[in-house]
Amino acid sequence: MVKHTKSKNDFDAELLLSETSKIGDPWVPIYQTAVDIEAHHFETAMSNLIKQPNINSTVIMRADILKENVFDVENGDSTFVSKLINKVPEFPSENPDDVILHRYLDDIDLRTISLNNSELKLNTKCEVVRRIIPRNPFKDHIINQTCLVLSSSNADPESHTEKESDDSVLVVYIPHIQSSDEIPFYLPPVYGVGILYHKSTLSIQYLPFNYQNYKTSPEIQLSLRNLDVTERPIRIALRLLQTSSKHSLGAKSGYEKRVNHDLVVPKIAFQNRYITLKKKYSSNLVNSWCESTDPKKHVFEDLAIAAFLIELWTVKYKSREDFEFRDLGCGNGLLVYILNMEGYSGKGIDARSRKSWSTYPENVQNNLSEQIIIPSVLLKPHPALSRLIPNVTDNFRYFQAPQLPSKNNCSCEAENVPADDKSTSHTNSSSTLTTYSSANLLESSQVCTTEEFPPNTFIIGNHSDELTCWIPLLGYPFMVIPCCSHALSGAKVRYSPRKQQKSNQQQNVSTYGALVDHTEDLAKQMGWIVEKEMLRIPSTRNAAIIATKRQPHCIDENDEVTQTRVLDILALEGGAEGWVENSINLMKKAPRNH
């Protein structure tokens, strides 16, 4: 017996290739490890892994459960059949050469195995047929697979011991294929995989193809027993053992998921859309990337966000003609490009143009604007003053900031902000300061107040930094993905945890979590009905705050009441003094890379 140590995480496993399987020939044991768990911990963990095979392999996107039979001695049997059982997964593509790979999807009959030679008496407790969807179904085949859970406690309930560690549980995976050369890359090249819990030990067992003939053809088993530990089937076995051990220990310790996904947009719809977009755009975008940032991170993240937005809009709007988007702080413009190319009307705005902008088609370039966002509430008169003097259009304020550039590099050229007749400029150690009036800024084509947006605008804030907390205050439906924490003045800030959390959870609330909560609270103060989704994107900052509807008492609120509400929030937040100056300064700074 050879001991194999995984030093990366101190995981010890014993290699069993020369041993006899406890579930009998023709099974071949591969690895085993000792675990301090009981049978129900293993069952709980494996129930989750059956539903989420992507935990075992990054090649797999998800599993769709097609049918499930549960045999419960105490509570009775139950059966589930999915509406997806007779549907082939769809990944719309305009390219006729894009062919989805799949095998025998109409084969939904449960597989069974013989354990006639087993030392253990096991009966079926649960049987599942799942459909495995790989991340790239244009490269890896979609297949159906039987998953069986067998238990000694189901075999003879009367002889069931009180000491649950004496129970044995076997989980078996059997792909629905007809020959060994049809096995997909993400599975080991065997007829079946067994994961066995027995006497505080977990082990991985392989059932070879043509196992029925193992007595007359010894090479059937020898082909597995002679494998080297570096070969892929053995490495997969170790991975399966590590995962089942880790998740079983997690079940014992009472591990609960920290976040719940797919609360707003169905997982299947999002993932199918993501696969389609990735196939359509990823290769070209990664290969032609001209920014200094990591292309794979930005490309795949924005493809995932685009997929989520498209499916969100499918849920919230009747058609794509019912709205148009504005991506505030759009950065490299990639999200705007993807959405425009998919037929969605909208524009992106950022204080600084990027190299990428000039690489997009002309129609996309025309939808990218180099502007700063100064919400109109900071430049217009108070509603009370507007009632008294209707002709007044600005609040008579003056701001000192560096001179805005006379030209920008984006496709939509903007003019200089005209300085007030009485403005002065002087040389500072770092730059020349110019005085701007609120009237100047309201008239400038380099300033976006958001008031010019059409009424059916949907605002996107994708890691939009200083704009994060402003977006819920602008009066349009939105989705904002917070990133860096800034106050309404544009200054960096660390928000405190919510008051109700301070008594027992304050130590668990991160700076990012506090920012997300604060953004959500601002939206609620503005009368929005807020939804929250933890996006499936390659980023730890993946919380999305979404609002498309207002509370009933705010639906018919007039502009004056809304503006007063914003001003009240500004006062509670400590004001927005410095926002104008900080925004103008952004046009002088180098873009952030995140």
Curated annotation (Swiss-Prot):
Keyword Transmembrane helix found: no
Keywords recorded for this protein, A-Z: Cytoplasm, Methyltransferase, S-adenosyl-L-methionine, Transferase, tRNA processing
GO function terms (MF aspect): tRNA(Ser) (uridine(44)-2'-O-)-methyltransferase activity
Main location, first listed in the record: cytoplasm
Coiled-coil region(s): none
Catalysis performed (reactions): uridine(44) in tRNA(Ser) + S-adenosyl-L-methionine = 2'-O-methyluridine(44) in tRNA(Ser) + S-adenosyl-L-homocysteine + H(+)
Enzyme class: transferase
TM stretches of this protein: none
EC code: 2.1.1.211
Record's protein name: tRNA (uracil-O(2)-)-methyltransferase
